[in-house]
Swiss-Prot record:
ADP-alpha-D-glucose binds at K52. One of its GO terms (cellular component) is amyloplast. The lineage of its organism: Eukaryota, Viridiplantae, Streptophyta, Embryophyta, Tracheophyta. This is Granule-bound starch synthase 1b, chloroplastic/amyloplastic. Pfam families: Glyco_transf_5, Glycos_transf_1.
Amino acid sequence: VFLSMRNKTQLAKRRATNYETHRNSSRTSSPIVCSTGMPIIFVATEVHPWCKTGGLGDVVGGLPPALAAMGHRVMTIAPRYDQYKDTWDTNVLVEVIVGDRTETVRFFHCYKRGVDRVFVDHPMFLEKVWGKTGSKLYGPTTGTDFRDNQLRFCLLCLAALEAPRVLNLNNSEYFSGPYGENVVFVANDWHTAVLPCYLKSMYKQNGIYENAKVAFCIHNIAYQGRFPRADFELLNLPESFMPSFDFVDGHVKPVVGRKINWMKAGITECDVVLTVSPHYVKELTSGPEKGVELDGVLRTKPLETGIVNGMDVIDWNPATDKYISVKYNATTVAQARALNKEILQAEVGLSVDSSIPVIVFIGRLEEQKGSDILIAASPEFVEENVQIIVLGTGKKKMEEELMLLEVKYPQNARGIAKFNVPLAHMMFAGADFIIIPSRFEPCGLIQLQGMSYGVVPICSSTGGLVDTVREGVTGFHMGSFNVEFETVDPTDVAAVGSNVTRALKQYRTPVFHAMVQNCMAQDLSWKGPAKKWEEALLSLGVEGSQPGIEGEEIAPLAKQNVATP
């Protein structure tokens, strides 16, 4: 799908009027030809489909093409963890000082769906594990970090600040040359929180990037980058930044007493802080429990903007899904569901009967996602006329508990402790309900994907689940759960049991069929969120920034998608 002729005409007109402005105001040696909108640089440790472990990768994969469709010039910068076959060496090298060493990084690039995808090449990223990195982005196993993560992410931020100035990119029909200095950086989560610090200490004070701004997006407050206070020296920042990092908590890890907190510094030093749903804003600023001890910093900043994520409506579309046997839309969902359910039941070894309601859980097996709550609550409902299928990987203890669930209830339950994309698609096509018992959920993607397939969510009332699932209209809410990870709260177990029973009573009723239709009638794409992101970034007032236009995203297989040496 390409920009319409009307939109191309608008872009051409704006390019003609803006060229002189950019030519005169640019501080780089190469000319910049821009059409409209803003130059936006997303910096993150994950970007789908190249590398991801969760929702961060989906956002950095899906939001930039939607902004590019509006006429903005968009780049993403992420580490090159593996030898991605669709990216090419730009032969552009820069030197950065990391810790007590000078490191040379190289940039790889491809142009996909209107976005410049840039990857930072260095042994710190490419040579951390034996063989393919895959999902081992932060450590060799779940819950274990690489010891040099601070240096790795310093390297990423320093390289990201060089990329807009040194990369001469010319794949776009409407833009050419380096991005220049009048840009908006979007730093994501604690891994990129030092970017605004380096921008101020190394560039702005030397007259570079004088008009650049930084938006800092919190995808998950639970991961903050807390390290021993002595590690501040590794960052090569002036002592004046120490108050932004300084942090005291009551925990003994990584050390007792004063620490540095990367996320605190990112919040303090950025120009605006955002997060991924309006309700998550309320939770983060409500107190230390849900704000994970950064609530005061967020109220001071303040954190006011939460924008619900969109989803990939190309990969996750029941009308075109290559992984499901019977494709369908809102008109044919009932008939197709019955057939897809029987195929799913046969695939996982359950009794084949389309009249039995099927509940699925798809996600990481960890405390945040509440998989331990679900396993504890399963006896409350699993012996009824229902089947439950759980798909996910994570902590070994929870994977073992999942296997025991299948052993205990062989007629009703199946647990698949592995990463299986085709099966996930089959589960959406064949299930009636998706259960999401998260202790906290900043936005959540799984409920959006489920609703697009007409699967009704049964979810806890937290974060983005509150904003995206409407009680009695598109799903069932179970209330908020205890956020403590150490134990499973019996109250939460009872809530799961009673609300699953409540949902099952509606199965195959007119109310249930209406909920399925309501789920599928929603626009869950990135188009709406992209407009809100545009508004938030325009408010930063970067010189030359303009609103975009109404355009269509470039399709994944369109001829504009190129990787050139």
